[in-house]
UniProtKB/Swiss-Prot annotation:
Entry similarity comment: Belongs to the cytochrome c oxidase subunit 3 family.
Any one GO molecular function term: cytochrome-c oxidase activity
GO biological process, one term: respiratory chain complex IV assembly
Protein name as catalogued: Cytochrome c oxidase subunit 3
Gene3D superfamilies, per database record: 1.10.287.70, Cytochrome c oxidase, subunit III, four-helix bundle
Lineage: Eukaryota, Metazoa, Chordata, Craniata, Vertebrata
UniProt entry tagged with the keyword Transcription: no
Oligomer and partners: Component of the cytochrome c oxidase (complex IV, CIV), a multisubunit enzyme composed of 14 subunits. The complex is composed of a catalytic core of 3 subunits MT-CO1, MT-CO2 and MT-CO3, encoded in the mitochondrial DNA, and 11 supernumerary subunits COX4I, COX5A, COX5B, COX6A, COX6B, COX6C, COX7A, COX7B, COX7C, COX8 and NDUFA4, which are encoded in the nuclear genome.
Gene that this sequence comes from: MT-CO3
Mitochondrial intermembrane side: 35-40, 106-128, 184-190, 257-261
Main EC class the enzyme belongs to: translocase
InterPro entries: Cyt_c/ubiquinol_Oxase_su3 (IPR024791), Cyt_c_oxase_su3_dom (IPR033945), Cyt_c_oxidase-like_su3 (IPR000298), Cyt_c_oxidase_su3-like_sf (IPR035973), Cyt_c_oxidase_su3_a-hlx (IPR013833)
Length: 261
């Protein structure tokens, strides 16, 4: 074994990018099968392989960072740049949905009745469940910041409490969103209003679930004393992602729920 004379992490060959890509293919194909043939077999297979890939990839990264010491300051700097670029790519992803919404709503076509919301659509009241959802996510933004400050100050118990509150609020948001979808007086097939509403809020909801998963992993890692006040990039990345999810929701609330109604 050669001695490493640099501060960078030469990653070992890993099967997880390949299995992750295959699970994504299975999930997207399974989604189409579910929509068109009402069969969830392929979707469940895709979700299962995705969960297994996530578990094993996370396990490898935790081992490399916490137990093998591969995440030197230089490596952490690279990971921070990577996370920033990833969040920028997510901003552009959601920009497409806002573009579609404003393109349709600012100049409604005669097919929509020349008005927005389109004729026959009864939008949700922005001062009911959507406003509660907004307050839940804003509260979770406060609690994740509390968790971050507690971690930097070395206060483990407060960090765990704040992180648990954030996860609980994230799960509560998801349940509220699911109930709102169930009771909505329009569907994804109700023209451009239904499609832009459900695609934009649905992808945001998916990001909340991903962010909650990220935070749950951080919670269990903190229970096992993986984070210190000066070495906790895994948690920092999760906090950045959660704040991004917060900000996207504020734009969704103001644009689609409040102005769009």
């Amino acid at each position: 074994m050669t001695h490493q004379t640099h501060a960078y992490h030469m990653v070992n060959p890993s099967p997880w990018p390949l299995t992750g890509a295959l699970s994504a293919l299975l999930m997207t194909s399974g989604l189409i099968m579910w929509f068109h043939f009402n069969s969830t077999t392929l979707l469940m297979l895709g979700l299962t392989t995705n969960m297994l890939t996530m578990y094993q990839w996370w396990r490898d990264v935790v081992r490399e960072s916490t137990f093998q010491g591969h995440h030197t300051p230089n490596v952490q700097k690279g990971l921070r740049y990577g996370m920033i670029l990833f969040i920028i790519s997510e901003v552009l992803f959601f920009t497409g949905f806002f573009w579609a919404f404003y393109h349709s709503s600012l100049a409604p076509t005669p097919e929509l009745g020349g008005c927005w919301p389109p004729t026959g659509i009864h939008p949700l009241n922005p001062l009911e469940v959507p406003l509660l959802n907004t307050s839940v996510l804003l509260a979770s933004g406060v609690s994740i910041t509390w968790a971050h400050h507690s971690l930097m100050e070395g206060n483990r118990n407060h960090m765990l409490q704040a992180l648990f509150i954030t996860i609980a609020l994230g799960v509560y948001f998801t349940l509220l969103q699911a109930s709102e979808y169930y009771e909505a007086p329009f569907t994804i097939s109700d023209g451009v209003y239904g499609s832009t509403f459900f695609v934009a809020t649905g992808f945001h909801g998916l990001h909340v679930i991903i962010g909650s998963t990220f935070l749950i992993v951080c919670f269990f890692r903190q229970l096992k004393f993986h984070f210190t006040s000066n070495h906790h990039f895994g948690f920092e990345a999760a906090a950045w992602y959660w704040h991004f999810v917060d900000v996207v929701w504020l734009f969704l609330y103001v644009s689609i729920y409040w102005w769009g109604s």
